[in-house]
Amino acid sequence: MPGPCCNDKCVCQEGGCKAGCQCTSCRCSPCQKCTSGCKCATKEECSKTCTKPCSCCPK
């Protein structure tokens, strides 16, 4: 079963993806916390430091 906000894509809201979103193809705008203050060296570190890992995370 897809996540709660999955139809063709995730539902976005201000700050990133809608809460509870389990969609792996989600492409929401980066949240303010990440765009303003995320200085992480790795994707794993970013996911722990930021409330929602965003586009600031290393690929």
UniProtKB/Swiss-Prot annotation:
Ranges where the record places region Alpha: 30-59
Residues the entry annotates as binding a divalent metal cation 2: C6, C10, C23, C26
* Protein name (Swiss-Prot/TrEMBL): Metallothionein-1B
Q: Give a GO molecular function annotation for the protein.
A: metal ion binding
| Keyword Transport attributed | no
Give me the residues that bind a divalent metal cation 4, please: C31, C34, C50, C54
Binding residue positions for a divalent metal cation 6: C40, C46, C50, C57
Q: Which organism is it from?
A: Callinectes sapidus (Blue crab)
Annotated InterPro entries: Metalthion_crustacean, Metalthion_dom_sf
Q: Signal sequence: where?
A: none
Q: Which UniProt keywords apply?
A: Cadmium, Copper, Metal-binding, Metal-thiolate cluster
**Which family is annotated?**
Belongs to the metallothionein superfamily. Type 3 family.
Keyword Protein biosynthesis, does the record have it?
no
The positions annotated for binding a divalent metal cation 1 are C5, C6, C17, C21
The residues that the entry says bind a divalent metal cation 3 are C10, C17, C26, C28
Task: Give positions of region: Beta.
Answer: 1-29
The record describes the protein's role as: Binds six divalent metal ions. Known to bind copper and cadmium.
Residue positions annotated to bind a divalent metal cation 5 are C34, C38, C56, C57
